[in-house]
Amino acid sequence: MEMTEASKQTTAEGSANPEPDQILSPRRSLELKQKKWWISVSLCIFLVLLGDSLVMLLLNFFYVQDNREDSDQDLQYRGTWLQALVQNAAFPLLIPLFFIFPSPKQNQETTNTRFLSFRLILLYISLGVLVAAHSKLFALGKLYANFGVFTLISATQLIFTAIFAAIINRFKFTRWIILSIIGSILIYVFGSPEFGGEPDENEEFYSIQAWLTFAASVAFALSLCLFQLCFEKVLVKTKRYGNKKVFRMVIEMQICVSFVATVVCLVGLFASGENKELQGDSHRFKKGETYYVLSLIGLALSWQVWAVGLMGLVLYVSGVFGDVVHMCTSPLVALFVVLAFDFMDDEFSWPRIGTLIATVVALGSYFYTLHKRNKKKMVELYQTENNIDV
């Protein structure tokens, strides 16, 4: 009996005065979680850079080899449904990854599962149509607009992303994020790579190119914010994810949205009659039909790499951050294009070298905000666990 009372007293004392390891375990758990988060964000940034670089290199290769300059004006602006399709069609390769990535423990307390599933299906369809529209507009804008017009108008997409994020996602801006946004826009304007498929001076349709590029920018900005809304308000609350953000959600989103976008682009391809011109396009390709097919396959894979990385940044951080990273990759992509091609005596000039330095500042400003946010969580946990004011 005495031993029992002594053991109870010891247990009570142990509960009142827990060991240091017990006190620090929540902090260690949060530190580990934050390290995993930083690794995930870094991986997504790498995927965006890799995908963006491969897309621009292969797009330039495709249009250089396509004998575009020797075609009549009407034919030069064809093939945009094919390019829109290529941006989305490689999603089946992501299906094995969906089953490889682990799924969190299901939340058995989730209610209204049918309502959530219905909302999710509607969002997937809506986002798929929006992505298909952006893909088509992007392909048209690239061909109709010259380099200067396309770059200047495309830079406004980050402004629209910020506006939509404030309205749709209730995004809170800090002075460091605003600095990052301004820097990213300037980086994109002065550091974007040249494009081999842009029109000659006598081919330009100034009113058309401006509106096409503008519409593509708005569609892209809106899609980023809607992706974030879908992640935070719908997908994360489903029973299978149990209120946890995991990379498997990115794969699911990309597969479902790309499926809808692919269907829309296929309908457009056959309805416009572009499918009948595919054989002629392959015959005009300078490197031959084999390289024509391989370049399209490479483009399709590269677009998926880029999209998965971008979607991951939207999940782990925000749509604004995803767009900032996308724009900040432009100087490095331009460097790769300059090394691989020679367009109109294009070179990696001093303004572009300056944008590389500005990229460090722009991303550093946003990273500083993320660091402060994570540090604040650590301080709050320290206060809670130690019951003191800091």
Curated annotation (Swiss-Prot):
Pfam families: PUNUT (PF16913)
Residue spans crossing the bilayer: 39-59, 81-101, 120-140, 148-168, 176-196, 211-231, 250-270, 297-317, 324-344, 348-368
Compartment(s) of residence: Membrane
Gene Ontology biological process: purine nucleobase transport
Keyword Transport: yes
Single Gene Ontology MF annotation: purine nucleobase transmembrane transporter activity
Protein name: Probable purine permease 18
Source organism of this protein record: Arabidopsis thaliana
Organism lineage string: Eukaryota, Viridiplantae, Streptophyta, Embryophyta, Tracheophyta
